[in-house]
């Protein structure tokens, strides 16, 4: 289980402050939000800080009992781009749809912070403990 940077570390490579090798547990990369092609008024603020919705893309035991579109707390400037779309458990829209939760076999991680996400976040932690 990983949160925020813990999610990002699971992937092959990160481009945060250079090019850095990740753990390679999941294939893919970590990139910065880039809204340079939009007008100033259309650009979401980076870092992405605050509450946003997570939309479930597949049944996942860690998301059991969580409403689709539930709000979670985010604080990040980078996001993961998995090579395999089948690992994406949930997505979030912040100027683009990005993977906000991934799940494969016994690996589960979120870009959001369950520990700061009140009842929904506690439910995810309870689901983990209950496995």
Placement of each model-derived feature along the sequence:
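Cysteine-nucleophile active-site neighborhood
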Residues: 1-48
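Amide-donor transfer/coupling interface in amidating biosynthetic enzymes
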Residues: 28-131
